[in-house]
UniProtKB/Swiss-Prot annotation:
The chain crosses the membrane at residues 1-21, 49-69. Gene3D superfamilies: F1F0 ATP synthase subunit C. It comes from the Bacteria. The gene is atpE. This is ATP synthase subunit c.
Amino acid sequence: MSLGVIAAAIAIGLSALGAGIGNGLIVSRTIEGVARQPELKGALQTIMFIGVALVEALPIIGVVIAFIVMNR
């Protein structure tokens, strides 16, 4: 097994771990905000989806980097 494959696995795993933690924090804070001010549910939900989309970009970048590292 080459070091490129190990590096790719680490890159994908860490990016997925980071995204999972980030998504959990974003959603939990949104739920707290809606519980405090239910009238802002729509605005908070929109901001939450934008935040989740930005956080999910990291694993995609991690996979791209993993493919680049594997092909070297």
